[in-house]
Design a protein with these regions (language model features):
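Short acidic loop-to-helix transition motifs that present clustered carboxylates
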Residues: 11-19, 150-154, 169-173
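Metallocofactor- and cofactor-centric catalytic cores in central/energy metabolism, strongly enriched
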Residues: 23
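Short, high-confidence coil segments that cap the C-terminus of an alpha-helix
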Residues: 27-29
Length: 176
């Protein structure tokens, strides 16, 4: 199903892996995720995904860019789908996704033995805040701490230069 047939959107921020799951679970032809990923705010934009939930690759990527380059104005874009087919993705998909995630735990017994292990989590203002704390609780972890200043949705990433967790600076608030 393409945009002309069915349009599905999320009612709030969601992590990229959940969107990839939703594309496959709902049988969508493709999906678009508005994101900066783990890059600085200058990279805010979108990623296009195909029906397998993976990012669009060649040759489809070039075809999409060609179509985008043919648009002179946003006013030229016309939605030609049936509004009755619009479905908002929200808590229902969250539940299905988290139920699926729970089944892929490598060692549930190890988690049970170490459920009081101290875990510090920060989404660095990103979408992980929507599901990671819930997933950790669902798995049984009891000693989870978050970084409150970075649990605020903000695509400007005000507490870091870059939200890339590969940079030590991005995790300094969590470590301290």
């Amino acid at each position: 199903r393409g945009l002309g047939d069915v349009y599905k959107r999320q009612d709030d921020m969601r992590p990229t892996p959940e969107m990839s799951f939703a594309i496959r679970h709902l049988g969508c032809q493709s999906g678009i995720i508005l994101t900066a990923s783990h890059n600085p705010k200058e990279y805010n934009g979108y990623k296009a995904y195909w029906d397998d939930g993976a990012q669009v690759l060649a040759p489809h990527d070039a075809g999409i860019i060609d179509e985008v380059n043919n648009i002179a104005s946003a006013a030229d874009i016309k939605f030609q789908g049936n509004p009755d087919l619009i479905q908002i993705i929200g808590e229902d998909i969250d539940k299905i996704y988290l139920d699926m995630v729970k089944t892929v735990s490598i060692d549930p017994e190890a988690i049970a033995r170490h459920k009081d292990m101290k875990i510090v989590y920060t989404p660095i203002h990103g979408t992980g805040m929507m599901l990671i704390p819930r997933a950790l609780k669902m798995w049984g972890f009891e000693n989870v701490f978050t970084v409150p200043e970075q649990m605020i949705k903000d695509g400007n990433f005000p507490t870091v230069i870059s939200p890339n967790p590969e940079n030590a600076e991005a995790l300094s608030m969590a470590v301290n």
